[in-house]
């Protein structure tokens, strides 16, 4: 049997495990042949050789490769497994009529586009629930993160972009870029099932009129665009358009989850991890504290809650190998808390530092009445404006959809800029949380870069900005939230060059907190590839060698 056949078989076994978990209605997910000890530790507390905190990109890579190496591994996920339909027959709700499934314990949705014509017509009152999208609000920056098995892969737009090699070498100079671009990026893209849109279909379909309009307008300003690969199955999307399958991307689904079409991590890495028979996932379990045990291992205090937020149990789970894959916010907070409360006192001062929003700035332009963008829009982006030249004004701008179900004449963009400003997480004893030290002024370089680009497009086309989409005030640039949190445990500073946390043995960071605040494109492919690189070395040198 070939390696690819082994992987396909593991995926099938893993998908069966997810299906069985849905039928059982429990929080423990494992293949039938998974070790009883791991299941017991998941249910009751106890010891398991390896624990991975989180189920996002870096966590999923680590769990799969540990499972393949024969290491019994427990993944702890604070969100739920999203595979049980709600009253409407769908697992996820759409963007236009969100309900409690949309949001992580909110009384009201907090969509990135919060208004239209300055009217509060976008967000809805909802019941607090363990929903799929969280907006974590700090003093002057908010961050969108996914909650559930699969993490951010459940709620992102799926744009699978590799960074410019020159910029990758600038931000991570101690990582061998040849290895990354020759081995680990291809491995990540293959596992993530990255695919490309049929360009002929793109040119003909009504669903991407919005992107073609933005491309034409960028061209008038002398700017080029590039097609962007995705983990959403473009072949499935074409069948959606033909009326052959249920719609998802063509039914305004994305930020609150896709019911069809998207190859999120539960269908790729995590399914393969479960299929090894060595990996167990425990949902609705949040790690609160980490301490080192006398034998050099780690003990975790873990809270189990239900989907209404009720505390059901507090457990202690111990392990020899601990991988933090809870994302830039989650992993950083756990380590900042551990350092500053004294449970891991040897963590260095770099823990919490080097955080950035990947230069994220959202903006929109008002088109002329004779230049409509289309009432029918795919929710999955397919084009980007590539104005990244490694200068301080570099921009890669995702041409974003605005699938409102009616004509808006709006061109929407998520600009990724080269903002050098960085924030720092510090421990707040009063709330027992990590507080982000970041000011709106620190986003001025990002706003200036985005403004320079879109001023150029507006001038070439005789258009203006939309000022009514980001709240009740006049505002053309949304600089107070981001989709791409990066940093907090930067590679080579808080850790060694492979994610080993400085000051401790067998403690690793494996997610976006390793990347120093910026990567110049949508970051999940880089996070995945970097995790592949790091865990390969860790398993060889730290796990199998011992």
UniProtKB/Swiss-Prot annotation:
**Record SUPFAM superfamilies:** FAD-linked reductases, C-terminal domain, FAD/NAD(P)-binding domain
What cofactor does its activity depend on? FAD
Q: Gene3D superfamilies in the record, alphabetically?
A: Cholesterol Oxidase, domain 2, FAD/NAD(P)-binding domain
- Disulfide bond annotation, renumbered to this chain: none
Describe PTMs of this protein.
Answer: Predicted to be exported by the Tat system. The position of the signal peptide cleavage has been experimentally proven.
Naturally occurring in which organism (per UniProt): Streptomyces sp. (strain SA-COO)
TM segment ranges = none
Q: Which PANTHER family match?
A: CHOLESTEROL OXIDASE, FAD-DEPENDENT OXIDOREDUCTASE 2 FAD BINDING DOMAIN-CONTAINING PROTEIN
Q: What happens after mutating residue 484 to N? A: Mutant activity is 4400-fold lower than wild type for oxidation, and is 30-fold lower than wild type for isomerization
Name of the gene: choA
Instruction: Choose any GO biological process term that the UniProt entry carries and state it.
Output: cholesterol catabolic process
Residues bound to FAD are: 57-58, 77, 152, 156-157, 159, 287, 512, 524
Q: Name one GO molecular function term.
A: flavin adenine dinucleotide binding
One GO term of the cellular component aspect? Answer: extracellular region
This chain's protein is named Cholesterol oxidase
Q: State the InterPro entries in the record.
A: Cholesterol_Oxidase, FAD/NAD-bd_sf, GMC_OxRdtase_N, GMC_OxRtase_C, TAT_signal
* Keyword terms, alphabetized: Cholesterol metabolism, FAD, Flavoprotein, Isomerase, Lipid metabolism, Oxidoreductase, Secreted, Signal, Steroid metabolism, Sterol metabolism
EC?
1.1.3.6, 5.3.3.1
Q: Reported effect of changing residue 484 to D/E?
A: Mutants do not catalyze oxidation (>100000-fold reduced), but do catalyze isomerization, 10000 times slower than wild type
Q: What is the effect of changing residue 484 to Q?
A: Mutant activity is 120-fold lower than wild type for oxidation, and the same as wild type for isomerization
Catalytic-site annotation from UniProt:
398, 484
**Superkingdom, natural source:** Bacteria
Task: Give yes or no: UniProt keyword Signal.
Answer: yes
Look up the signal peptide feature and give its range.
Answer: 1-42
């Amino acid at each position: 049997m070939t390696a690819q056949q082994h992987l396909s078989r593991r995926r099938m076994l893993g998908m069966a495990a997810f299906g069985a978990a849905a039928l059982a209605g429990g929080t423990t997910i494992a293949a039938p042949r998974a070790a009883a000890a791991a299941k017991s530790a998941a249910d009751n507390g106890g010891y398991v050789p390896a624990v991975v905190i989180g189920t996002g990109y870096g966590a999923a890579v680590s769990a799969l490769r540990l499972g393949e190496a024969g290491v019994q591994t427990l993944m702890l996920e604070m969100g739920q497994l999203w595979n049980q339909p709600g009253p409407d027959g769908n697992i996820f709700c759409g963007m236009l009529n969100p309900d409690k499934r949309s949001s992580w314990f909110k009384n009201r949705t907090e969509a990135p586009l919060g208004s239209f014509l300055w009217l509060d017509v976008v967000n809805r009152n909802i019941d607090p629930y363990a929903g799929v999208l969280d907006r974590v609000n700090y003093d002057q920056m908010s961050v969108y993160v996914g909650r559930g098995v699969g993490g951010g892969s459940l709620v992102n737009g799926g744009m699978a972009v590799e960074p410019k090699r020159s910029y990758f070498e600038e931000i991570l100079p101690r990582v061998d870029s040849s290895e990354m671009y020759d081995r680990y990026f291809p491995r990540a893209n293959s596992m993530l099932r990255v695919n490309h849109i049929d360009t002929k279909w793109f040119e003909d379909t009504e669903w991407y009129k919005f992107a073609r309009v933005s491309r034409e307008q960028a061209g008038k300003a002398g700017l080029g665009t590039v097609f962007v690969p995705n983990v959403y199955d473009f072949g499935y999307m074409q069948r959606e358009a033909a009326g052959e399958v249920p719609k998802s991307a063509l039914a305004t689904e994305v930020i609150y989850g896709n019911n069809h079409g998207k190859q999120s991590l539960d269908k790729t890495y995590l399914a393969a991890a479960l299929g090894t028979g060595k990996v167990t996932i425990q949902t609705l379990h949040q790690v609160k504290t980490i301490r080192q045990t006398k034998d050099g291992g780690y003990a975790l205090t873990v809270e189990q809650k239900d989907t209404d937020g009720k505390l059901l149990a507090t457990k202690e789970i111990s392990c020899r190998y601990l991988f933090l894959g809870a994302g830039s916010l989650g992993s950083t907070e756990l380590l900042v808390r551990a350092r500053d409360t004294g449970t891991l006192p040897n963590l260095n001062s770099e823990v919490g530092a080097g955080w950035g929003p990947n230069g994220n700035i959202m903006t929109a332009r008002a088109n002329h009445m004779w230049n409509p963008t289309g009432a029918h829009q795919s929710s999955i982006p397919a084009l980007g404006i590539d104005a990244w030249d490694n200068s301080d004004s570099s921009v890669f701008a995702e041409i974003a959809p605005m699938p409102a179900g009616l004509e808006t004449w709006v061109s929407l963009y998520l600009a990724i800029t080269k903002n050098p400003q960085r924030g720092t997480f510090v421990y707040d004893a009063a709330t027992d949380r990590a507080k982000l030290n970041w000011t709106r002024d620190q986003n001025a370089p990002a706003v200036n870069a985005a403004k320079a680009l879109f001023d150029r497009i507006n001038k070439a086309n005789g258009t203006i900005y939309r000022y009514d989409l980001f709240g009740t005030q006049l505002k053309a640039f949304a600089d107070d939230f981001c989709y791409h949190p990066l940093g907090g445990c930067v590679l080579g500073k808080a850790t060694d060059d492979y994610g080993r946390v400085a000051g401790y043995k067998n403690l690793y960071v494996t997610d976006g907190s390793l990347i120093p605040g910026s990567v110049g494109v949508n970051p999940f492919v880089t996070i995945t590839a970097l995790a592949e690189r790091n865990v390969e070395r860790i398993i060889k040198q730290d796990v199998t060698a011992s």
